[in-house]
Amino acid sequence: LKETPLHAAHVRLGGKMVGFGGWSMPVQYPSGILAEHRAVRTAAGVFDISHMGQFVAGGPGAQAWLNTLFSNNLDRIGPGESQYGFLLNEAGGVIDDLIIYEYAAGEFLLVVNASKIAEDYAWLEGHRVPGVQLSDRSDRFAALAVQGPRAPEIFTAFFGAEVILPARFGVSVLQRDGLPFFVARTGYTGEDGFEWFFPARAAEVVWSELLDIGARFGLIPCGLGARDSLRLEVCYPLNGSDLSPERTPLEAGLGTFVDLKKEHFSGRDALLQVKAAGGPAEKLVAFRMTEKCPPPRPHYAVFSADGATRLGETTSGGLSPTLAAGIGLAYLPAAAARVGAPIQIDIRGRRCQAVIEKKPFYKSANLPPKPVATVAI
């Protein structure tokens, strides 16, 4: 397993290390998943996300080139802004979901999923056109996600009161003690927060300083367990589980991040055919358990309310600390994917009652306003 530059720091803090996407990562610290989850919802938590891939694209035509491969529309953003979207195969299936940050005019940072770094880079490189530079800086840069309602105070305490907070989905390039930081107001928790990208050589120093400065704001280190329960409450998809090359963004209910008005991008024609046929045959639904039973996990069978028909299977699942109930995501036939419809989940041989709910399960009251430009109309 690969190790992030903070591996030794996690072990020192008592992090329980597990394999994830080929990386050794902390699933939790001695504080426990529940405490870590609640810290992010009420104060702040910091996650090591150095396992994620970081590519830089630039040069004349970089934006136009990226727009032929990216489902969203980069023409809608400018320097200091970002956009979420997908790399799609020609069938419209998801190769990866990612955020593209325009950190300077015509210069882009692509942050991709850890297990997809090599595949994504090869795919992008295979489509690269003359004049566009593409580089993989994943091994040279670390990344931390500081998430929670007190994240802005921590940002100010760390970088200085004179440094302006980036807007939501914004990105700023900052200097601190001679070290460059790319700081974006993005995250995977549904709370306000920031993702910091900086040279890996400084990872240990930044981590310990951040924990020291953040302590008075209630900041604690958090692992993958809390990251998963937090993202599940806001129905953010996990690539490889809820998203795959066999599933389109339209099936996943993420058509907002696909701009079919663009002249061309990989997968567009296939998605137009899906729309012309009346929409996807299956849809990703959110469900909540309505009786006391173990929490749902991925690959559990989903049945109709009467238990007679197998409708599909779960892609994600777990316990929601906020709802104090099991929640999950599942692909079901479009006709069965109705909010309020009762279903059954087969949990270890027992049929448990659940109901399809409107996404998301949780909405933070602490989010800054969303800029209009980041969403394709």
Model-derived regions: residue spans:
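Conserved, structured C-terminal
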Residues: 1-21, 25-29, 103-377
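Acidic, proline/glycine-enriched N-terminal capping motif
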Residues: 1-88, 93, 377
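Acidic active-site catalytic centers that drive phospho-/nucleotidyl reactions
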Residues: 48, 97, 195
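Well-ordered mid-protein domain cores that form the structural environment of catalytic cofactors
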Residues: 73-127
